[in-house]
């Protein structure tokens, strides 16, 4: 938070962090939250993540105020440039209990990223806990690794593998998604 936040803003922040912990607990994920003051938001997040040895950072998607502004906003861009931890960007339009399908768009060579099996595990748990079908969209090699992982560790997950060429897949998906679908 910034130093100029009011006490009401701080209390609202604490309330939101508690809600985030409750949602994470429903997905069998331990979420450690922290409420701190910082003069620079991105530096505050960076320092807190190092102090607490955080493995993952979850941030909300910034909505641009002007066309000149970056899609991700200055705070997220700073984090992406300076952080060596997994960053999850969230823009929740529909509560998780109302999600109908989960779609996962996977970039080419994602299996070579250090956090590949970590996020695969997180998505699988979400599918198990919600009972929703997961649609994985990616390259054949990546999909085969995910399928092998699911067959070994998450046999109850409902899923479909959809091979893509990469490039225009997000555009196509954006036209097919419903308001109650989750896009990862």
For the regions a language model picked out, list residue spans one by one.
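Intrinsically disordered or low-complexity boundary/linker segments at protein termini
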Residues: 1, 55-141, 145-148, 154-157, ...
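Residue-identity detector for glutamine
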Residues: 12, 19-21, 32-34, 67, ...
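Well-ordered alpha-helical segments embedded in enzymatic catalytic cores
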Residues: 19, 44, 118-122
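Structural beta-alpha unit
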Residues: 25-57, 155-184
């Amino acid at each position: 938070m910034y130093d100029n936040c009011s006490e009401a803003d701080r209390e609202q922040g604490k309330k939101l962090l508690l809600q985030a912990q409750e949602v994470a607990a429903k997905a069998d994920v331990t979420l450690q939250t922290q409420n701190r003051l910082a003069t620079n938001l991105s530096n505050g997040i960076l320092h807190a993540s190092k102090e607490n040895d955080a493995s993952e950072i979850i941030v909300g998607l910034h909505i641009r105020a002007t066309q000149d502004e970056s899609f991700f906003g200055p705070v997220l861009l700073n984090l992406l440039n300076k952080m060596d931890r997994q960053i999850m960007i969230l823009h929740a339009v529909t509560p998780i209990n109302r999600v109908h399908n989960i779609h996962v768009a996977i970039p080419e060579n994602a299996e070579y990223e250090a956090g590949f099996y970590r996020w695969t595990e997180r998505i699988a748990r979400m599918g198990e806990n919600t009972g929703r079908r997961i649609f994985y969209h990616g390259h054949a090699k990546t999909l085969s690794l995910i399928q092998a992982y699911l067959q070994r560790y998450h046999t109850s997950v409902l899923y479909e593998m959809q091979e893509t060429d990469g490039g225009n897949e997000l555009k196509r998906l954006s036209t097919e998604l419903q308001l109650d679908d989750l896009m990862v």
